[in-house]
């Protein structure tokens, strides 16, 4: 197993804007606006993928029994587990939620990462994919458009059930921006997009049991 990165060494995968007060405030605003969706998801286990070790490891607002918290590194993810993007060390179909915060756009292979997210989800489990909006003036790092993120999810077997524009419109340092994720036309310029996707399993339709055949005797008629 490779040696752990020393805390004094900068993580090459963390973009400088996340280290600034404005970047940390933007992340806080985005997560605050995602809480209404987060509180709709219940279950025993979940996973939180965050963009930096400097971000809090706790996923505030979750309704799960336990959340595995990992952070982005130049080699993949580290934290409670260490792994590459395409090799999440979790059993298939074991999680009720995977919450990815600005991790798809920093992945060397986002298709593999989304495929792994879909694999570890239970049937009807939810993936909350938060990506930086390429059209926003608030973001300062890499971004991923909602169309591409949704396509990656569909190709991995996930269905999009809701999509929200969240976060501030402009970079700021002071307190959190007011408002809710909504349907105003200019919401498309917010800092991030939240896709809520679910893993669908084709269910088997039970066949009705046919009544036992009755032989007709002379003098009997059907009906």
Residue ranges with predicted function:
Residues 111-123:
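A short glycine-rich, Lys/Arg-flanked "PGG" loop and its adjoining helix->strand segment in the class I
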Residues 1-40:
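Class I SAM-dependent methyltransferase Rossmann-like catalytic core
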Residues 126-150:
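Conserved class I S-adenosyl-L-methionine
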Residues 96-109:
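A short SAM/SAH-binding and catalytic strip from SAM-dependent methyltransferases
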Residues 86-98:
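A short acidic, Gly/Pro-enriched loop at the edge of an enzyme's catalytic core
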Residues 142-167:
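Short alpha-helix
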Residues 32-88:
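Class I SAM-dependent methyltransferase SAM/SAH-binding core
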Residues 179-223:
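C-terminal lobe and adjacent flexible extensions of AdoMet/dcAdoMet transferase-like proteins
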């Amino acid at each position: 197993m490779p040696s752990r990165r020393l805390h004094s060494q900068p993580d090459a995968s963390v973009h400088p804007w996340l280290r600034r007060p404005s970047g940390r405030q933007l992340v806080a605003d985005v997560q605050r606006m995602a809480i209404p969706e987060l509180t709709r998801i219940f279950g025993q286990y979940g996973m939180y993928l965050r963009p930096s070790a400097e971000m809090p490891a706790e996923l505030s607002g979750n309704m799960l029994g336990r959340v595995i918290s990992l952070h982005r590194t130049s080699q993949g993810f580290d934290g409670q587990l260490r792994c590459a993007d395409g090799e999440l060390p979790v059993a298939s179909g074991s999680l009720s939620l995977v919450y990815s915060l600005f991790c798809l756009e920093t992945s060397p292979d986002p298709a593999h990462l989304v495929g792994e997210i879909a694999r570890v989800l239970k049937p009807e489990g939810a993936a909350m994919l938060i990506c930086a909006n390429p059209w926003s003036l608030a973001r300062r790092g890499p971004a991923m458009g909602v169309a591409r993120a949704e396509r990656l999810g569909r190709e991995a077997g996930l269905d999009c059930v809701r999509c929200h524009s969240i976060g501030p419109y402009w970079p700021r340092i002071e307190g959190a921006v007011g408002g809710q994720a909504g349907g105003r036309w200019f919401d498309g310029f917010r800092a991030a997009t939240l896709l809520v996707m679910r893993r669908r399993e084709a269910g088997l339709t039970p066949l009705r049991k046919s009544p036992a055949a009755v032989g007709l005797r002379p003098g009997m008629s059907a009906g």
